[in-house]
Amino acid sequence: MNQLSQETSPYLLQHATNPVHWKAWNPNSLSEAKEKNKLIIISIGYSACHWCHVMEHESFEDDEVADVMNAHFISIKVDREERPDVDSVYMKAIQIMTGRGGWPLNVVTLPDGRPVWGGTYFRKQDWMQTLSQLQEIYLSAPEKMIDYADKLHQGIQYIGIIQNENQNVIPSAVEAQEQILALVEKWKMSFDLEFGGIASSPKFMMPNNYHFLLRFAHQKNDNELLEFVNLTLTRMAFGGVFDTVDGGFSRYSVDNKWHVPHFEKMLYDNGQLVSLYSDAYKLTSNPLYKQVIEKTLSFVERELMNEDGGFYCALDADSLNAENHLEEGAFMCGKFLN
C-alpha cells in the first residue's frame, strides 16, 4: 500500500493518493528491497516541479502503470528539497548515463541501491515498456545489470576522486590566468549575440555564469564581453521570463528569445539574479537594472515570505484554469509585441 500519508513533505503528500505503493526513503524501504530481491524505482522531484506533476498525472495516477510498478518493484519517492544528498548521488549517475539531468529524476536500481538505468520525464507507454524490459533482464540475466552497476558505481567514485585531486592542486598565478582566458574564449563561441545568453533553447539564465563574466569583463577592461553581458541582462529584463507586473523571474525560457517562460518561480533563482543585476547596476548605472532589482525584491517579499519571516522555496508553474483543472501558466495572460 501507499505509505506517504504520514510524511510531512508537500511533495510526498502530493503522491499519497496514487495507486502506486510509494514508500519514503528510509532504512525499512531499502531493507525490504533486499529481502524481496526486487529492483527499486527511485523517483525524485519537488512540489513546484511542473514535469513532476505531468508524469504523476500520466503515469503514477494510472492503475495500469501502478500494477506493473507494484508487482515487480519497490517504489520510493524522494523530495529533493528534503534529501539533497540522495538527489545529488542519483543526479551524478543520470548525468553519467545520459549526459544530462533534471526533474523528475527517475532511477531504477539494484536491491542494494546501485543505479542501472534512469532519466527524467517519460511518457506512460515508454515508462511501462522500459520497466518491463528491465524486469525481464533482471530475471533472465541479472549478471548484466550487476556488471553495469559496478562500472557505473566506479564512474561515480571516479568523479569524486578527480574533484578531490583537483582540489589539492593549486595552479600558479600565470597558469590560473591562462586557464581562465582559455575558458572565456571557449565560452564566447557559444554566445547568442542577438538575444544574449547561450545559443540554444530552452534557455536558462545561469546567474553565476554571468556574474563571473561581468567581473571578468570589468577587471580585464573587455568592453566586448561587458556589452554581451549587458545585452543578456537587457534581453532577459524585456523578455517574458521577467514578470513586469508582479516582478520576479521564471525558471527558464522555452524559446531562444527569452519570450516564452516556464512559469515556475524559484527563490534561489531570484536571489541570485538580484545579486547579478545589483553588480551590473554598480558598473553601468542602468536604470532598467534598478527597476528589475526593486520589482524582484518586492515579489520575493510579497509572494515568497511567510508571516514568520521565513521564505517559501518556489511558486508552482501550474494553477487552476477556468475549468478548475491544473494548467501551466493559467494565472498569466498577455501577448507578444513584435
At which residue positions do the language-model features occur?
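Replace the tail clause
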Residues: 1-338
